[in-house]
Every structure is written in structure tokens, then in C-alpha cells.
Amino acid sequence: MASKSDKQVTVEVNNNNGRSRSRSRGRSQSRGRGRSFKITVNSKNRGRRQNGRNKLQSNQRVRNIVNKQLRKQGVTGPKPAICQRATATLGTIGSNTSGSTEIEACILLNPVLVKDATGSTQFGPVQALGAQYSMWKLKYLNVKLTSMVGSSAVNGTAVRISLNPTSTPSSTSWSGLGARKHLDVTVGKNAVFRLKPADLGGPRDGWWLTNTNDNASDTLGPSIEIHTLGKTMSSYLNQQFTGGLFLVELASEWCFTGYAANPNLVNLMKSTDKQVNVSFEGDNGTPLIMKVPDTSHFARTAVARSSLPTTLARAGQNTTSDTVWQVLNTAVSAAEIVTPPPFNWLIKGGWWFVKLIAGRSRAGMRSFYVYPSYQDALSNKPALCTGSVPGGMRVRAAIPTTLQFTQMNQPSLGHGEVTATLGRSIPTPGDTFKVVLTIGQPLAPNTLNNQTWVNKTTTAPQGQHVVKIAKDTSNYTTMQGFTPISNVTWYTEDFQPSEEPPPISGLQVLVDSRKKADVYAVQQYLNHPSNTKDQLTSIFLVKVTTSFQVNNHLSYFYRAAGTGTAVENFKIRGATSEQNISFSEGWYLMTNTATFNPPAPPGWIWKNVELDNNTPYIVDQGMMHLIMSPPVGTQLLFEMKTTVSGTRNVSHFDHDENPSPVWCDALDAADVWELPTETDTESEEDEDEDDEADRFDLHSSYGSEPEDDDENNRVTLLSTLINQGMTVERATMITKRAFPTCADKQKRSVHMDLLASGLSPGNVWSHACEEARTMGTNHMPNVSGDRGHAE
């Protein structure tokens, strides 16, 4: 109390938790109880009125004295040893795809858990300090939402950010979220959600424990949840918007005290698994189990980073790992996943905790026990079902969804020599994958046990469009074969499970110059049916992102009998039928087959020609599934690449006009070679020189030039091609184009320069050959300065 006469300020602190010492109990028996104490500050007036400045100083003096006395009595907890200000970028807030309440983010504020969902275990200063000190608290917290779209670009969605003080999943509606401390955000505008120490205080005089292996109510701290309501629509295209809405950042000052190094806490992992099939099962009195494919990113990460259990299970029970994972479902499918009662609300709420069940996977699935809270997971008390899934829903397939998962704890906190885990480490894939494709239902007009329709031409009927797989406007091919794929499984080259790679940058599927699908993997198969013809089949694994329909000239392959006992492989039916093809969102295997005159260059080849009626095709590796529609569920194995390097484009000429087309590098516009224009006055001597230039030995035919760095490469490639059964002439030609000699480089350089000067093609080639002969005679290639232009 404060008396008016002497200006004394008295502060009374009662720290006995509401209990007083009994009168009949001795003093010694009440030790350890809370105690009461008073702080009196003498702020007596000295006879004259204080001005505003003196009053401010007096009030500050009172506060300092009170705070000092409170600290002496231990009411405010330990003094911070170190404080760290930091801004953590946590990722993006996606759009709402269902129109109902969807959770987009759940941010746990324990410093060792504040990471972005990139799959990285890298840590910053906050995580490093969290692994060194035993207690933490927040001085303030600002959650910044930076808009990623304009205020008029999208509409139909409201965003609400709220504080969950217990960090426990709950069944909360949009109205329930409004009962929390929250902030409503308008899409297209930046916002900051500000929290004070009173909102963030821990149970130990404002402090929280850092080690996540301890009691959940003492370690996690509060959490920040971000929800959206209403389907996000594009204002310009009048269709659903699927991009990000906000970038989320945490700006705060973490304080730490009580040094206790737990270095393994910095290695906790957070990542995202897209398009993973999730299902739940359980029966009356049994734990709720979540199942995911063992080839999914989440399953492989959990197996690799889940530690062996430190306790044994009872008879008849499964053993679980000691590592706990928080799972956040950010996709619309949370409301569609069928869950046994009574924990339907937990799954629809969008986030829960799981622990891996030890043992080998069954039927290609990994199993996890589901827990409604982190404390239940630490205590190994899974959610128990009171019934099973209704009979009519048991046959429903697993729902593809997007999971964000966070490793919550690390049972071993020191630097162990070898971490005991339930599986092997995740291999780092390269650009080559073994891809297992599961055939889906045939796409109309294809049907089971019948021929497979393919697009025959490179043009569509009037007013329609073909499907193009393109790198740019000059390098593309037209889709011919189209096979629906129900499931794609990725493996590394040594057949270790791998996660899905990102789409190939620069490649896309176009219809009338509009992107409809992404290309994830490619492969080409080059075969040589004869010395005068090469067959090239390109396959593309694509994922349609926007449904579309095309009308094309369709035909099919058939077996054609030759004369006598000879049987040709198969031909394309000459007559075509105009039919519609409807592509819905999902995976497809698209193919294109072309024939051309050899030789074929190294690298990826772009060839866009229609299927020829009079050409017999061989059944190569990329066309086997185009004879008849494969049965549903059939699995095809391909080795595919996720990069397209050394792109080459074939000049489009008829076979009769030019038996040796020119290849041009499509990656560098400055190096594109053009085929010299043929004239009627070309002499027989010029033709002989052409043949001489194209058919040369490993060394230049114009003289003995000194060896260069590619000599060994030429010999190795030539020997390899001949050993594989190729003719010496063809092997030599391929070797020449792969590793040209200095004379050939000089000849080509002079050829290009003289063409640019305006000389006729015949004279240009004669001068180029003469320059190459001169270089071979002098043994001194002109590699700098003037290239020796002929006049």
C-alpha cells in the first residue's frame, strides 16, 4: 500500500501458492513452503512540488528498486545469460483449395524447432544457442506475413493467424479460432501479428525448458497457427489459384540461461513430402495407425532418423521408436481421409504426432502410431479407436496429400560415434533414376484388349491443336503415344528408394502455346534398323497440372507380313480417325517415334515428323506398350534422366533430298549451323570433296597433323563402336563428329566465315578443304587471329 503522508510505496509478494503455515505446526515443519515479503520504498516529498521530469525519475527509481528486490527474492527466475535477436523465414502460406477451414502452418516456438520446411538440418544462431542452454524465453515475438500476390490478383479467401498457448491439437472451428488471441489478414496486404511477454511466458517464472525430451508442458512453448477459409480464386483467369499467398517470418528475441550442452538438438529435421498416399486403420480397442508408402520421402526420412527404442514392448505389442514426429497436413484431403472413430477430429484438425513402429514394412507400407499430443507421444500412449472404419469406406484408396513433418526430439543428445537407427541413410540421387510406372485405366478412345491409338500427324484438324513437348519454339516434338500412369515410384541407379525430383527446368507440355503439364523425366532410345535408317523413340514422364482436351488424327500400329517367310515388325495404319482425348490431372507417359538418315549426333535429339505409312518400325524399348493397351496395374521399368543436355535439332528434309542431315546445337544460338544451299551447278569434284571430308580416318585426310588432347578419346570411341558390331565406316564417321581434329575444326570455321562473306557454296567448300590441307601440311594450325578468309 502507499500512504499519502510519507509517500512510502509498499509491495507485498505472496509466493506460498495460496497456502499458509498452520498455527499448530512448528517453524521447521513449514520450510520449503512459499514465503511472503514486503518491499518499502521511501519516496517522501521534500517540501516542494515536483515537476514532470522529477516525477518521471521518481517513478523510474521506484520501478528499479522493486525489480531489484523481486530479483533478490527469486520471483522473476534466473537472469538471462545471453539474448539473441533473429528473423527466421519459415516458408510460404498456400492457397485454400476446398473452401472450408484449412490449416496452412503450425509454428512451434521452441528455438530448436524453429526451422523452414526445406528438408535441411542446417541451423542458425537461435538453434545453436538452444542446443547449449537448458532454458529459454521470448522477450517479444512478431509474426510477419509478406504478401506474395497483389491485392486484386486473388479473391475469396480470409486468413487468420492465432496463438495456441498449449501447442496441442484441438478441434477448432473458424469461430473458435476467433476466440483465441488472433489477427485477421487481408490477402494482398502485409501484416504483423505482435505478441508480448505476457502471451509467451513459461511455467518456470516465465522460462521454458529447451530439451524436447523433457515434459511437453515445460518445453514446447506456445504455437502459432495460420488458417485459411474460402476457396482461393484468380481474379484474372476465373479459375482456382494454386500459388502461395504469404511469406512467413518470425522476428523475435530469444533469451537463454543455464548452460547445458546438448549438441544433437541442432540436427532436428523439418521437411515436406508432396503427393504422399496416407491412410489410417484401427479397430475397437486398438491404437490408431497411420500408413504411408515406404518409398515416400517421409517414410524414408523417418526410418533413417528414428532411433532404436530404449525400452522393450510387452508381449503382443509392437515396439516403437523413441523419436517423435509432428505431422502437418496442409492439403484439402485432410477432410477426405477416412479415419476410425473417435479421432476423426484430430486428422481433420490438420496436425498430430506419430512414432514409427519398428520392423520391416509390409505390402510396401510403413506404419506409425498416432498420438493426440506430444506428451502422449513421449509417454507412449497412442490414440485408441472405439470402432473401425465403416464397411463401405474400407475399399477407398489412400488419399494423396501434402505432409509437413518435423522431428521433435533426439533421444541421444551427445556426439555418438555412430547413430543407432532403424534403417540406412537416405542416398543422394543424381540425374538418372530407375522409375517404376504403374499403368492406369486406358485413356479413351483406347480400351483393354484392343489396339492402342496414337497421334499420327504433327498437325491437328481445323481449329484444333496437337500436344507438344517443347524446350522452346524451335526445339519441340509432337506427342504420339499417351499412356495414363496411376503411380510413379522413384529409385536411384542402385535401386535405393528416392524422393520425387522436381520438374525439369525449361521443358513443358504445351497446347496452343499454353502450358498444361510439367516434364519430370525423359529418355531416348536410338536404334539402327539398317545402314540407311535410324529410329529414335523419345519418352516423357509428365504430370498434367491443368486438365485439357484435344482432337487429333489418330491411328494405330499393326503387324504387317512381308513376302515369303519374312515378317516386318509393324507399320502405322494409313487411315486416320479424328477423335477427342481428354487429359485429367495426373501422371502420363508420352512418346514420340521418328526415323531419319544416319548419322545421329550425341546428346538429346529433337525430331518432329509424323509417322510414315510406308516405313516399317521396330518394337524398341519405348514402344512396347503401344501395341496393345497394357492391363491395369502392370508395372513398367524405365531408366530415365531428369536433365536434357547437349540438345540437338534435326533439319527437316525428305529422305530423297539429303541423305546426311546437319545437326545444330540448340542450346547456343550463336553456334547454330545452317545447311549450305544446294545448287544445280554443283560439280562432281565438289561431291567427291564432300565425301572425302565426311569419311575420314581418325587423323586428318589432308596430312599428318600433330596429336591433340582428344587422340585417346578418338581411339577409345572407335574401338568401342566397332566392338559393338558397327561398321568401320560408320564408327569412323561418328568418332569424327564427336572428336573433330584440328584440321576439321579449321575447315568448318573457314566454311562458316566464307558463307557469311557471300561466296557460293561450291567455292566455299573448295576453299575450306584447301585450308585444311594447308594446315595439315604445315603442322601449324592457325588458332589465333585471322582465320584466313578466302577472297
Swiss-Prot record:
Q: Detail the disulphide connectivity of this chain as listed in its UniProt entry.
A: none
Basic: region residues: 1-71
The UniProt annotation puts the region (Core attachment) at 395-424
> Region (P2 globular domain): which ranges?
425-648
InterPro entries with a match to the protein in the record: Astro_capsid_N, Astro_capsid_p, Viral_coat
Any one GO CC term of this protein is: host extracellular space
Q: Which residues fall in a compositionally biased region of kind Basic residues?
A: 20-36
Q: Which UniProt keywords apply?
A: Capsid protein, Clathrin-mediated endocytosis of virus by host, T=3 icosahedral capsid protein, Viral penetration into host cytoplasm, Virion, Virus endocytosis by host, Virus entry into host cell
- Could you confirm whether the keyword Hydrolase appears in this record? no
Task: Output the Pfam families linked to this UniProt entry.
Answer: Astro_capsid_N, Astro_capsid_p
Does the keyword Cell cycle feature in the UniProt annotation? no
What segment(s) does the record annotate as region Acidic? 649-791
Q: Name one GO biological process term.
A: clathrin-dependent endocytosis of virus by host cell
- Acidic residues: compositionally biased ranges: 677-694
Report residue spans for region: Inner core: 72-264
Q: Where is this region: Disordered?
A: 1-55, 677-713
Lineage, top-rank taxon, reads Viruses
Annotated site (Cleavage): R314, A315, R394, V395, R424, S425, R648, N649, E657, N658
Which protein family is it in?
Answer: Belongs to the astroviridae capsid polyprotein family.
* Record's protein name: Capsid polyprotein VP90
The protein's organism comes out as Human astrovirus-7
